[in-house]
Design a protein with these regions (language model features):
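Flexible glycine-/small-residue-rich
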Residues: 6-8, 57, 108, 143-146
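Flexible loop/turn segments at secondary-structure boundaries
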Residues: 14, 84, 150-151
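Residue-level signature of catalytic and energy-coupling elements of molecular machines
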Residues: 11, 17, 76, 89, ...
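Conserved helix-loop functional segments at active or binding sites
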Residues: 23, 27, 84, 169
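P-loop NTPase switch module centered on the Walker A-proximal segment
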Residues: 1-70, 78
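Canonical P-loop GTPase G-domain recognition
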Residues: 102, 112-171
Length: 171
């Protein structure tokens, strides 16, 4: 099984992406609770290309620092097209570098809200610069909308498939 951390700034769509992956690939989605009311971690296990993948994220940014230990097989970095890379994005990249976790793909989320192609391209360049500063190169970028894909919009669902393809190709 490949353990894939879904990382990025808070509210950039990590949990929505996991829910969408679970729906499209008929995964087994679970919520693991910190206590009786607080979700600690959301995860889904899917089968793809003969392999099993466990995608997970933590509800609080501190969950990554407290629970990741470098045994993860990879990470997907989620960045909102409307916000670009923010402090949580930078921290996720730093944490991956510190723990030796390879970022297998970058998912540019919420693309349905940005009409200007140039703005998305500029934001992608900012993300690429951030990755390059940490020695991370040749990482595929996939544009999409976890929300619309989760609602069954086929053009957006296909982009989730491209994301899973990119992760699988890494291995």
């Amino acid at each position: 099984m490949k353990n894939i951390a879904v990382m990025g700034h808070i509210d950039h769509g990590k949990t929505t992406l996991i829910s969408t992956i679970s729906r499209i690939f008929e995964g087994d989605k679970k919520e693991i609770f910190k206590n009786s009311e607080t979700v600690l971690r959301t995860e889904t296990e899917i089968e793809f290309g003969g392999d099993t993948y466990l995608f997970f994220d933590y509800e609080e940014d501190s969950g990554y620092e407290e629970n990741l230990n470098g045994t993860e097989d990879g990470a997907v970095l989620v960045v909102s097209a409307t916000d670009g890379p923010l402090m949580g994005t930078e921290r996720a990249v730093e944490l991956c570098e510190e723990l030796g976790i390879e970022i297998t793909a970058v998912f540019i989320n919420s693309c349905e809200w940005v009409d200007d192609e140039e703005l998305i391209e500029l934001m992608e360049m900012d993300v690429q610069d951030l990755l390059s500063e940490h020695g991370m190169e040749d990482i595929p970028f996939i544009r999409g909308s976890a929300r619309l894909a989760g609602m069954g919009y086929s053009g957006w669902e296909e982009r989730i498939g491209k994301l899973i393809d990119a992760v699988a190709e890494h291995f």
